[in-house]
Amino acid sequence: MALRFPRFSQGLAQDPTTRRIWFGIATAHDFESHDDITEERLYQNIFASHFGQLAIIFLWTSGNLFHVAWQGNFESWVKDPLHVRPIAHAIWDPHFGQPAVEAFTRGGAFGPVNISYSGVYQWWYTIGLRTNEDLYTGALFLLFLSAISLVAGWLHLQPKWKPSVSWFKNAESRLNHHLSGLFGVSSLAWTGHLVHVAIPGSRGEYVRWNNFLDVLPYPQGLTPLFTGQWNLYAQNPDSGSHLFGTSQGSGTAILTLLGGFHPQTQSLWLTDIAHHHLAIAFIFLVAGHMYRTNFGIGHSMKDLLEAHTPPGGRLGRGHKGLYDTINNSLHFQLGLALASLGVITSLVAQHMYSLPAYAFIAQDFTSQAALYTHHQYIAGFIMTGAFAHGAIFFIRDYNPEQNEDNVLARMLDHKEAIISHLSWASLFLGFHTLGLYVHNDVMLAFGTPEKQILIEPIFAQWIQSAHGKTSYGFDILLSSTNGPAFNAGRSIWLPGWLSAVNDNSNSLFLTIGPGDFLVHHAIALGLHTTTLILVKGALDARGSKLMPDKKDFGYSFPCDGPGRGGTCDISAWDAFYLAVFWMLNTIGWVTFYWHWKHITLWQGNVSQFNESSTYLMGWLRDYLWLNSSQLINGYNPFGMNSLSVWAWMFLFGHLVWATGFMFLISWRGYWQELIETLAWAHERTPLANLIRWRDKPVALSIVQARLVGLAHFSVGYIFTYAAFLIASTSGKFG
């Protein structure tokens, strides 16, 4: 008999019910649980799968370049970035009638197209690409990298090319190579690209392989580098009247510290960006030579951690035992990596709009909104994943003997204090913030808006003032016109920063008031509650007073049977599951706030946000309802328009979201009865009963139904808001 799916678990393969299929899919990537897995095969499988991941990423990015080159309007967009709509790709749909064809034929195209809201046009333009041929070249190169990645993945599964476990656990070598090779060399290479291709491109000089060695990016070449006159590279920067992509108003500097934004493109100065990447390259190239490998010099990670004992002896044994704990636990390493990546992704969201690096992207409002929202949601999923793998570490990999009285053990020892403090903070934030909002709602409902409780964010305004924002009148640090910091700032460092901070046309340090104070605390409530659920899930993963033997039941278990009351919903997986709802909720508030604040800024009516954001009805009526008008009227008996697809997606997103509750609210018994009735009917229906299946149909397990419900809730929620965001922004600003 042929091997049945799943081949990695013979026990599951022999299951006579449909559970075999769903559990097989659920555990396909849990290599640790597979039959006859060894530590060596585990590491090798994960290593090989990374190359597959890279191949997919390169193929996807290649596809972006290829479709824009083939079906887009990059060359005409380059000529007029502010008025031509960038096309992502063509749409072919047999359902389109003539009105639809006309509605979606935009951006100078000959047929229906999708408009690009990803910012890739601005990025490619900034880094020096100018023609469709450039895009095709990039697409081919990435396709080549994709093929190389696939070959590398296959190669590293062959016996002669499989790395050993000791190679995977050589932390110092990995750190050195990742710091120097991955970050250092790539940052240096990127600096080279910016200096040799992008900066000349921004000054109207087209540099490619055929003239790459003939065009000096700086008139004196490398002379200032070797003579120690590095400051020459910053002299004669582009002027404030520089027209991007032309020589008009351009300078010769390549590495500057101007600060602020290019007046025409509203993006960071390319020469500042090149300088930044050079500094990053230098730091990481040095950092990549810090750890001891073949030559007996440098730090040993183990020695560093063993030596890190807090003074006074009141904090236990510090980091003793951590090296082996981390180095032998893939879940711990993954948890750390996801936590770092999650924070970085959220920082990307914050900085892409406040300090835009790509030419003209600040004036593409829909892309700005889409990119912010996209990166915040991605960050949320990655961060919750960090805690999930932290909890799995505690269940599968944590060894109490190896970690006696170190920081990990002490976290577990103090978990009641940690969890109760987080609980207290969440309760305080929740009751006070909601109390203020509801009080203000009631005052408006009773016709006495002057009785609202409005709190000025004095401390936050003071911090903004310290960084140079003068409108609050604090006269402190950089906003004090006669202070030494202010005077130094005008000449020595970042002279453009102060003018940028005080220019109301960008998103740097937006003016804040009582509405911002309230929504910041609502977001703080969401962050603390999400953290509470995640931290509790990880710290209670091994056991709690209620269920001391919890670790023996694994990461995800529904309950310990009917005989032991109160053990349902307390697995570490359940904590992750609940936290994702809170995470989505919190990021909802974050993106609502960002979007509404910016819509009013871009429309020039900031008073609408300031007046309506201090009470809940204001958010519901003046943000959600008012901005959804295009979606609830996207197509009607009188015809359709280019927003119709978003109106349809808005409805579809609601449908997916609502379907989630079907899985979340009704449990297994209901579905089992329904399935058995349907199977009975199927077997007695002519023609239909010719189709048979081997597996007995059974309802999803409790945990699986929750996962399916959560997936529908998350996807539907994001689809719905994405449609709302893009339609409401593009409907106003194009």
Curated annotation (Swiss-Prot):
Keywords, ordered alphabetically: 4Fe-4S, Chlorophyll, Chloroplast, Chromophore, Electron transport, Iron, Iron-sulfur, Magnesium, Membrane, Metal-binding, Oxidoreductase, Photosynthesis, Photosystem I, Plastid, Thylakoid, Transmembrane, Transmembrane helix, Transport
EC number, UniProt record: 1.97.1.12
Catalytic EC class: oxidoreductase
Cofactor-binding details, from the entry: P700 is a chlorophyll a/chlorophyll a' dimer, A0 is one or more chlorophyll a, A1 is one or both phylloquinones and FX is a shared 4Fe-4S iron-sulfur center.
Transmembrane segments: 46-69, 135-158, 175-199, 273-291, 330-353, 369-395, 417-439, 517-535, 575-596, 643-665, 707-727
Known partners and oligomeric status: The PsaA/B heterodimer binds the P700 chlorophyll special pair and subsequent electron acceptors. PSI consists of a core antenna complex that captures photons, and an electron transfer chain that converts photonic excitation into a charge separation. The eukaryotic PSI reaction center is composed of at least 11 subunits.
Record-given protein name: Photosystem I P700 chlorophyll a apoprotein A2
Species this chain originates from: Piper cenocladum
